[in-house]
Amino acid sequence: MNKGIVDQLTRLSIRLEELDKLLSNEKITADLDNYRKLSRERSEIEPVTRFYHTYQQVEQDLATAMEMSVDPQFRDFAEAEIDADKQKLADIETEILKQLLPRDPNDERNIFLEIRAGTGGDESALFAGDLFRMYSRYAEREGWQVEIVSQNPSEVGGYKEIIARIIGHGAYSRLKFESGAHRVQRVPATETQGRVHTSTCTVAVLPEADEISGVTLNPADLRIDTFRASGAGGQHINKTDSAVRITHLPTGIVAECQEGRSQHKNKAQAMSVLISRILDKQVRAQQAEQAAARKSLVGSGERSERIRTYNFPQGRITDHRINLTLYKIEQIMDGELDELCSTLAAEHQAAQLAAMIER
């Protein structure tokens, strides 16, 4: 195992012993906030230290087996034990590295899902509607809740743009690799010659910012406009200026919400979207710097980056970042995204592991 990783594991083992002593101290247990903080730290490092202790025990077993192998009487038994112990060490090392990987602090958050029609005119808007249905069906399968924040329907169906909030444990961890350009190849219903048309939509997945996100907005930097909602909602919505648009003047970032009947609720939702977009911009700037040194296997997540092609005549979906092709387009468009999401997450983790080993 890499010496740097061994040193890190040794430090964690020492820290675990320190935490056990602290948590048994009455003065510590009397301070509930500090007790919770230390308990949380212990729960985070205990699994990897347990794996490390097992690794050390197997190392000792391997050393014993190698000593036994020089004795002709025990050679066959010892060699079998050596092979088994080496495999155990490799398996445990993989688990240790996974435990040491930096965790995305946003993984458990809700998300804002933004889908926008791109090139392809009406067909692009229709595909935006198909993508929204796909993600909505996936959310339904996961037991998540979907709330439409704003929508701009197309005259022919689908959406020029739709923004939704998806509420559910781990929503960001499952869908964060969906950001990018999605290309569709199919024969439009209006096509009389049977020609395949190509259209695109862009998808953005933003983790919802929480109240302690660290973003403080100066009211002087905000322009808040109210207007009459143009979407669904009935006569009441169209008679009142319930829709809200907030512009962050320093960055030019805009967020709006018009789905609720209450201007107050729409303003709160628009503010949440705005803060999430500002945070997303900051994170992307950091990721761009990191990507300059090492390009991630699953891509940068840039909105303009083509990540996936949906070819309906061939019944296939190809994710270009990991060269994965699945011939199950109907199931995927109906929200069966587990195989795609899991494979992307696994490839991302493999890239992280490779980078850790190289260091």
From Swiss-Prot:
Gene3D superfamilies associated with the record: 3.30.160.20, 3.30.70.1660, 6.10.140.1950
Pfam families xref list: PCRF, RF-1
Residues recorded with modification N5-methylglutamine: Q235
Keywords: Cytoplasm, Methylation, Protein biosynthesis
Gene Ontology molecular function: any one: translation release factor activity, codon specific
Record PTM text: Methylated by PrmC. Methylation increases the termination efficiency of RF1.
Keyword Protein biosynthesis recorded: yes
Classification via SUPFAM superfamilies: Release factor
GO CC entries: cytoplasm
SMART domains in the record: PCRF
Subcellular location(s) of the protein: Cytoplasm
InterPro entries linked to this entry: PCRF, Pep_chain_release_fac_I, Pep_chain_release_fac_I_sf, Prokaryotic/Mito_RF, RF-1
Family: Belongs to the prokaryotic/mitochondrial release factor family.
Protein's job: Peptide chain release factor 1 directs the termination of translation in response to the peptide chain termination codons UAG and UAA.
Protein's UniProt name: Peptide chain release factor 1
The species this protein was found in: Nitrosomonas eutropha (strain DSM 101675 / C91 / Nm57)
